[in-house]
Amino acid sequence: MNAAYAKAADANVLTIIKGGKKERTNSALKSDGKPKATAADPIRDIADVHELQNYFREKGQLRNYLLVTLGISFALRAGDLLSIRLMDVYGANWEVKKEFYLYEDKTNKRNRIHINSVSKQALEEYRGMIKAEKPDTTPLFTSRKRDADGKCRAITIQQLNHILAEARKEIGIEDHISSHTFRKTHAYHMIKESNYDSQVLYALQHGFNHSDIRVTMIYSGIEDDMVDEVKERMGSLLI
């Protein structure tokens, strides 16, 4: 039986009615089936990703370099990325772990995070800047500001957005980037590099908790590219 779509009370949630029962699901589509407006793009040109990484490294801002590297590699929501602690990624002797587990704040889903070779190298480089005596519950991405008890606290999503906005302006990246950009960039390049492989699409859909693959295509920005390509082909037919 085809699903009928009804307007949800929460504009960010799509309510699907199947067999008389309502199911709520996170979706990149509005209740009328049209894409939601988005405040962030993926970084489509991998050269821009490298330029963003190098921008922070050359300024000696290894925390921000690590944010970009892990943000795109791990494909976590910004809140989950900023919740990572030293003890999550470093072992007792400060060795970088191969993987760790994290409960997603939005879904409470237990997520296994693989630390790839580039992320490992970035974590090893960043390790020299850490002042903690041992890997503990200190946030990995610490702010200069302290909490009410004088303890280190993580940077906020607002601070992350400001950091990225300033870098975008300096570098001249055309894509609009914000805290959502990391996940979208991960999905965009995974799909492109795989040549739209169905297994990759399914893995991304499952990992992002999307209701179907088209939602993932919209979220990643791939569908926009496909529409642009079709329009370009149409243009080639005209005189």
Please identify what each model-predicted range represents.
Residues 1-29:
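Short hydrophobic short-linear motifs embedded
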Residues 2, 84-119:
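Conserved tyrosine-mediated DNA breakage-rejoining catalytic core shared by Y-recombinases
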Residues 46-74, 196:
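Basic, Lys/Arg- and aromatic-enriched nucleic-acid-binding interface segment
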Residues 65-79, 101, 188-193:
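Short pre-functional
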Residues 73, 185-208:
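C-terminal catalytic core of tyrosine-transesterase DNA break-rejoin enzymes
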Residues 89-93, 197-220:
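Short, polar N-cap/turn motifs at the start of nucleic acid-interacting alpha helices
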Residues 104, 208-233:
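Catalytic-site neighborhood detector that most strongly recognizes the C-terminal catalytic loop/helix
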Residues 105-124, 137-165:
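C-terminal catalytic core of Y-nucleophile DNA break-rejoin enzymes
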